[in-house]
Regions:
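N-terminal targeting peptides
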Residues: 1-171, 180-191, 195-198, 202-206, ...
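Pentatricopeptide repeat
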Residues: 33, 49, 64-69, 84, ...
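C-terminal interaction modules of eukaryotic adaptor/scaffold proteins
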Residues: 511-553
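Short, conserved catalytic or interaction motifs in soluble domains
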Residues: 128, 185, 198, 233, ...
Length: 553
């Protein structure tokens, strides 16, 4: 644990230039507390806790600060943050002095709410009251700085604390490394890991796991395995979390065979895979369409007595839908329902998407109604999937009804919602309505993306409104959106259809200069149009260029 040398508290206090006077009214927010602060039982309800605290305040003499701190801690643990702070203020107003544990709760509150100035003020109060901060205090400050993204300040705090005689323990370093990894500063976390032995601390699995996790999430799997090998060399035993993370990384990188081998390794060294291990592997296999292999893993899971959960079945359903075996997905869905396995919103979203993909929109709508009957609240993904399916089926009125329903139920719309509707409207030639919807979209604060602009430009070109399409294309560039190859292909095709070959060729020549390489579709569009107009020489020239670029097989 933390050890402290003689005069360091006073020096550290002034080294950070803490404020000596922050009004209690400024400390109005609380935090999710750590288990180390709250080992006592929680009050049964908020009202009971407040009543108990109020009765204790009115006692003469009042109970020990320990009793008050227990209630504050239990409130914080139950996420009743403002209430806990309000009661703390009442405690102070009655002149009842907090102890170190009470102040640790206050610091954790400020850190959890990212109010670091107030956290440091509470930290200063520890010194003013003659206490010495413990490992919980300093760990909490470090965690708070990391939560706020203040990596440099966190590392500076760590260095300064060491310089003034404080020694951190394994828990503190685990917290610091985890905090750095959570905000994407994996390199800084690795640096801390490398320096830990200099301070007499032996690295452990809790320090390695967050770094391995961060590396796997950005598919730096080889780097993650380097750390895994380092753990083994240092006789630091990996745990189920280590293996789960590595299996996830391998699946994310498409290295499914290696992921299965690692699962076998786990079992051989008597580390029991949990439901998360199997779910990760099943999901990875299903996403690659390897349903047979996924079912084999499911069989192993059953043999080893690990019960599949809703996530397991959702992955299987999604896998079947990806390979257009929607009936098999529905069989899994029905089996879940019959076995009283809790179907969630994601389960319905998967099936609704599967039916919409194969144009069975009415079946999707039936599931949507079933969700309501079961008091499951559809989310934005549910609505977007149905709106897209209806729009592709040219049932725009129904799709627009769902848009209205989203607004009425307070369900957020996004750019995907509007892109589906715009595409559907252009497909049935409701051009003016589409442009009105585009205006409504922007007025509601939703920024269009490149797909939105491609839908608009394509729809206008196909409706014979090339001039309007060109205006939007130019507006796209003026607003800093980078047209992609699809955007250029749409406009070039529009020019060719109107016989504007010079404009089409000019735009083709400008593409590369604008950072967008033409593809086979670009050349084929122009070449086909030139041949149709007997511009054979120019068409053959472009054909040779296409071959030279390796775009013709």
């Amino acid at each position: 644990m933390l050890s402290l040398f003689s005069s360091s508290p006073i020096k550290l206090r002034y080294a950070f230039q803490f404020s000596n006077s922050v009004p209690h009214s400024a400390l109005r927010l609380c935090f999710p507390s750590t288990s180390s602060l709250h080992s006592h039982s929680q009050p049964q309800s908020l009202d009971e806790a407040v009543d108990s605290f109020t009765r204790m305040l009115s006692m003469r003499p009042p109970p020990s600060i320990i009793q008050f701190t227990k209630i504050l801690g239990s409130l914080a643990k139950a996420n009743h943050f403002p209430t806990a702070i309000s009661l703390f203020q009442q405690l102070q107003a009655r002149g009842i002095a907090p102890n170190l544990f009470t102040l640790n709760i206050l610091i954790n509150c400020c850190c959890g709410m990212r109010r670091m100035t107030l956290a440091f003020s509470a930290f200063a109060k520890i010194f003013r009251m003659g206490f010495q901060p413990d490992a919980v205090t300093l760990t909490t400050i470090l965690k708070g700085l990391c939560l706020c993204g203040n990596v440099e300040k966190a590392l500076h705090f760590h260095a300064t604390v060491l310089a003034y005689g404080f020694h951190f323990d394994q828990v503190t370093y685990g917290t610091l490394i985890n905090g750095l990894c959570k905000i994407g500063h994996t390199s800084a976390a690795i640096q801390v890991l490398r320096k830990i032995p200099q301070h007499g601390i032996v690295p452990n699995v809790v320090m390695y796991n967050p770094i391995i996790d961060s590396l796997c999430k950005v598919t730096l799997v080889s780097d993650a395995f380097h750390l895994y090998s380092e753990m083994l060399a240092k006789e630091i035993s990996p745990n189920v979390i280590t293996y789960n993370t590595l299996i996830y990384g391998l699946c994310l990188a498409g290295q499914l065979k290696e992921a299965i081998l690692l699962l076998n390794d786990m079992i051989l060294i008597n580390i029991t895979p949990d439901v998360y291990t199997y779910n990760t592997l099943i999901d990875g296999l299903c996403k690659e369409g390897k349903i047979k292999d996924a079912k084999s893993v499911l069989a192993v899971m059953a043999r080893r007595g690990v019960k599949p959960d809703v996530v397991t079945y959702n992955s299987l359903m999604d896998g079947y839908c990806l390979v257009n075996q929607v009936n098999k997905a529905k069989y899994v869905f029905n089996t879940m329902a019959q076995s009283r396995e809790s179907l969630d919103v994601q389960s319905y979203n998967i099936m609704i998407n599967g039916f919409c993909k194969i144009k069975m929109v009415d079946e999707a709508l039936n599931l949507f109604e079933e969700m309501r009957r079961k008091y499951l609240v559809p989310n934005t993904v549910t609505y977007n999937t149905l709106i897209d399916g209806l729009s592709k089926s040219k049932r725009i009125s129904c799709a627009l009804d769902l848009l209205v329903e989203m607004h009425e139920r307070g369900q957020p719309t996004n750019v995907v919602t509007y892109n589906s509707l715009l595409d559907g409207m252009f497909n049935i030639k409701r051009v003016d309505k589409a442009l009105m919807l585009f205006k409504e979209m922007k007025e509601s604060g939703i920024d269009p993306d490149i797909y939105t602009y491609n839908i608009l430009i394509d729809g206008l070109c196909k409706s014979g409104r090339l001039i309007d399409a060109i205006e939007i294309f130019q507006d796209l560039s003026d607003k800093g959106y980078g047209p992609n190859v699809r955007t250029y292909n749409i406009i070039i095709n529009g020019f060719c259809k109107e016989g504007l070959f010079e404009e089409a060729l000019t735009l083709l020549s400008k593409m590369e200069g604008n950072g967008c390489l033409p593809n086979a579709v670009t050349f084929e569009t122009v070449i086909r149009a030139l041949f149709e107009k007997d511009e054979n020489d120019m068409a053959e020239k472009l054909l040779r260029e296409m071959v030279a670029r390796g775009l013709l097989n």
